[in-house]
């Protein structure tokens, strides 16, 4: 009997070992990782480009409504969806949490092979405290509001309320704890946006009694230590402001930063950053997903802080946020302005990778996605309102008639399809620094990029038969001494040698094609009229040009593979 028991035990142990070997190990938690020249979002062990879209603020409050949205989202070729979760949706009664909605959103995303980024609408959404639970709204004594210079309170929780901070943190950590339990092994959720466009609207700073007392106290030493240690890398306008007041290493907010509304804005940025840092740390202790904020950008009509949310992580105060909230991984811009190239440059910094959680989804949005990812090593792009993508349709010139009613034909859908094909190539090039991009308009019709052994001249497309398009865009990847992959729409491209040797570049071979599972599949060979930009050979030769280059039309974006040669 003893031998029989030992034999059975051995068999059971062997079966258990075999079974455990067949269970796949849980994928690593999504995280940010510095790889060469880029900081990238790593998902399932590989760099991930978030070809994303954000739903309307309350779309995600109804699973029934989302059932109508998921199929549309899939047709636009997204791989990631940003969805809001309101504090009041999950904690309607204090201490009683209901994550049914969260589980339903996870299930919906998984059924459609999508990943999620949750947006925690807690203490603040668009500057206001409109998503806090009713029991918070009703108890102003326990959860005090900010006050304006006119003496009136606003529907904005004070950043200095410990009760508000603790209540929001408890709910947020319960949410993160639930995500860890519900998503371990699946990794559907990639990142968390903490709050939404924080900042005080209506005044440059909180004028409540606790806030006035805090403003009169000295600037916290940890902020001044950060500014001193990072002085060479500070945003130029912030450094100028600090130095204009004497670059003091101690003093009150007005003594250190001057008597202006900008000092008020810096004060508010510090208070918001400390509040969110506390929450982010607590959430990461439960489940360490990357965390980012989003910024309501200063609009052309805005004059002073308070016209826009004062304290929001604008370019001027991002350094304040880096000092006050080290647990926040990214300060991201919501770019609802048409000069995307300017704003992406302001937010992409060595300590701040570019992610755009809100912007346009039309043709301009397609160009934004290419430019942010290609020029600024962006980890993703996300237009707002993806649950209703019909309004992103491209119109025929001079009409209100869509070019196509099919969601798959939207400019963003086409752009995302190409970016998805090229993701392994792009993320590798981001790390190597062998990638660039162009975002062109009739006002900014050309961009030159030094890449590899050539300067790549990218112009908005011009020909005799058609008007100049309003917008053109391209991504260029160098893959060898004389070899490039280019994807774009409504652009034309010349290559100019910038290394010793023959001074004129010719096209050895050009082909269209596509990537399938990371492998290039050539299509047709391109030559003749499809590459000639200048038939006047004397004029071209005088400029050290062959007169031939790459041409991308309005049917794009498309991908071309080019090999060059040089001659005297």
Q: Where are the regions that the model predicts?
A:
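Catalytic-core region of carbohydrate-active enzymes that cleave or remodel glycosidic bonds
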Residues: 278-289, 316-421
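Short, acidic/polar
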Residues: 59-75, 309-324, 343, 369
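Polysaccharide-binding and catalytic clefts of secreted carbohydrate-active enzymes
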Residues: 142-318
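Aromatic-lined substrate-binding rim segments of carbohydrate-active enzymes
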Residues: 65-139, 272-286
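C-terminal beta-sandwich/jelly-roll accessory domains of carbohydrate-active enzymes
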Residues: 458-468, 484-568
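Aromatic- and carboxylate-lined catalytic core of secreted/periplasmic carbohydrate-active enzymes
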Residues: 370-501, 512-517
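N-terminal carbohydrate-binding accessory modules
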Residues: 22-78
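The substrate-binding groove and active-site-proximal loops of carbohydrate-active enzymes
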Residues: 52-61, 84-100, 150-170, 256-273, ...
